[in-house]
Amino acid sequence: MRLRNKPWAEEMITNHPEVIVPNPEDFKGNWQVVFGNNNPIHIEVGTGKGQFVTGMALQNPDINYIGIELYDSVIVCALEKVLEAKSPANLRLLKVNGADLNKFFNKNDVARVYLNFSDPWPKTRHAKRRLTHGDFLKLYESILVDNGEIHFKTDNRGLFEFSLISISEYGMLLKYVSLDLHANMPEDNVMTEYEQKFSAKGQPIYRLESQFITKL
C-alpha cells in the first residue's frame, strides 16, 4: 500500500480514543473492560482501510473485533470507515505493530486471527517477514485460545502456497482451502478493498482456514 502523508491524521486519531484505543498494553488480559462484555475477540492484523473489520463487526454483533494497523495515514482511513458505520460498540482499532501482539494480548485473549492480503515479501531473504511464517504462527498461538483459528485471504499464489506449507509444517489443521473463493463464494463473505479490486479484474482469491491443535 502506498502511504500518502496526511498531516491531519495524528490529531484525528488522538480525538477518537473511543475507537483507536490509547495505551492498549493497559488492557492486556482484560479486554472485557474495553468492550463491556466477555464475547470472543477476533483480530485483523493489517486492517488497512478498515472495510473488512467494519463489515465483520456489523455482521456479527456478538463478536468483538480489533483491527491492527501501524501507520497513521492508513489507520485514519479505517477510523473514517468506523465513524461512517456509527462506531459499532463491538469494534476497536489499535495503532500498533502486528509483530508485537503479545505486548497487548495474553494467552486466551483472542479467538481468531484474520490475515487479509498481507504483503507477500516475495524475496526469499524476506521470508520471515511474511505473516504466515512459523515465527508469526508462534506469536498468534501465544495469544489465541486453545484450538484458536487463523483465516487468511490473498491474491498472491506464491504467498498462498508458502502459507499452506508453513501452516502444515507448524502442525496446524487446515480446515478449509479454496483456490478460487469467488467461484463459490460463501454468503457471509466480507470483502476487503483489495479483494474487490482484484476479483473485479478476474484474479482468483485464495483462502484458507486453519486451527491450532492443542498439545497434550
UniProtKB/Swiss-Prot annotation:
Catalytic-site annotation from UniProt: 119
Residues engaged in binding substrate: 123, 155, 192-195
Entry keyword Calcium: no
GO CC terms: tRNA methyltransferase complex
EC top class named in words: transferase
Residues annotated as binding S-adenosyl-L-methionine: 44, 69, 97, 119
GO MF entry, a single one: tRNA (guanine(46)-N7)-methyltransferase activity
Signal peptide bounds: none
Pfam families: Methyltransf_4 (PF02390)
The enzyme's E.C. designation: 2.1.1.33
Catalytic activity: guanosine(46) in tRNA + S-adenosyl-L-methionine = N(7)-methylguanosine(46) in tRNA + S-adenosyl-L-homocysteine
Pathway of action: tRNA modification; N(7)-methylguanine-tRNA biosynthesis
Key words, A-Z: Methyltransferase, S-adenosyl-L-methionine, Transferase, tRNA processing
Function, in words: Catalyzes the formation of N(7)-methylguanine at position 46 (m7G46) in tRNA.
Record-stated family: Belongs to the class I-like SAM-binding methyltransferase superfamily. TrmB family.
Name of this protein: tRNA (guanine-N(7)-)-methyltransferase
Organism expressing this protein natively: Lysinibacillus sphaericus (strain C3-41)
Gene behind the chain: trmB
